[in-house]
Amino acid sequence: MAADEELSGVWQARVVTLFPDAFPGVLGLSLTGKALQDGRWQLHTHDLRSFGVGKHRNVDDTPAGGGAGMVMRADVVGPAIEAAQRFARGRWPILYMSPRGRPFTQKMAKDLARCDGVTVLCGRFEGVDERVLEHFGVTEVSIGDYVLTGGEIAAQTVLDATVRLLPGVLGNAESTVEESHSNGLLEHPQYTRPAIWEGHAIPEVLMSGNHAEIAKWRAAQSHRLTQSRRPDLWAAKGAKE
């Protein structure tokens, strides 16, 4: 979407990337895609290549001090971020998708959804010149303890988790209340028809119509799953209480 097509007051994502064609990607599908079409949020990309230097629009160079790979240049990434930030207003953080960043969490998604927008920098190669991150006060964010070939997939993950929390994006707002991580715990198991499949029956309590017992069962299952699969979350939950 072009900059002159902005809708006033709508939550925006501005993505600085070498591969603008990667967007909207999955963000253009399902609920996030419908919300994008309906103008509930906006997505703009800024092509790093257009800020490249020299005849070949170079965006990277060899690491200072030696080493493998290439590093994205400050005099390329810097102007690209400045171009994106010209449209920033109010609370508008700049994120850099990086395996050394802060772990992305549901709480972070909620915080981003309360902002007016976000600029996301997608790295490539060995990363970005550190001076850019320091100059713009960029927050480094990681979606897990592994390395991707670039930040585009990670950026879409962060944006998907955030956009679905914006008002009016989800058909049922209660979905965000009961799902995993909404209260620091993993979500309870879900079932639907048929009542019996391949010899496996839906737990009787869920078919009982007793809402108090159903709520009790779901809470117990949520606790059980969190304890067994995410002891770190369980410990953090206990510490808060």
Swiss-Prot record:
Primary localisation category: cytoplasm
Q: Output one GO BP term.
A: tRNA N1-guanine methylation
Gene Ontology, cellular component aspect:
cytosol
> Which E.C. number(s) belong to this protein?
2.1.1.228
Q: Which reaction does it catalyse?
A: guanosine(37) in tRNA + S-adenosyl-L-methionine = N(1)-methylguanosine(37) in tRNA + S-adenosyl-L-homocysteine + H(+)
Q: Name one GO molecular function term.
A: tRNA (guanine(37)-N1)-methyltransferase activity
Where does it reside? Answer: Cytoplasm
Which Pfam family, an example, fits this chain? tRNA_m1G_MT
Q: Name the coiled-coil region(s).
A: none
- Keyword list, A-Z: Cytoplasm, Methyltransferase, S-adenosyl-L-methionine, Transferase, tRNA processing
Q: Which InterPro entries match?
A: Alpha/beta_knot_MTases (IPR029028), tRNA_m1G_MeTrfase_C_sf (IPR023148), tRNA_m1G_MeTrfase_TrmD (IPR002649), tRNA_m1G_MTases_N (IPR029026), tRNA_MeTrfase_TRMD/TRM10 (IPR016009)
Say which domain of life the source belongs to: Bacteria
Q: Which residues bind S-adenosyl-L-methionine?
A: 123, 143-148
Is tRNA processing included in the keywords of this UniProt record?
A: yes
Q: How does it assemble?
A: Homodimer.
PANTHER family xref list: TRNA (GUANINE-N(1)-)-METHYLTRANSFERASE
Physiological role: Specifically methylates guanosine-37 in various tRNAs.
**Family matches, as HAMAP family:** TrmD
Similarity annotation? Belongs to the RNA methyltransferase TrmD family.
Q: What is this protein called?
A: tRNA (guanine-N(1)-)-methyltransferase
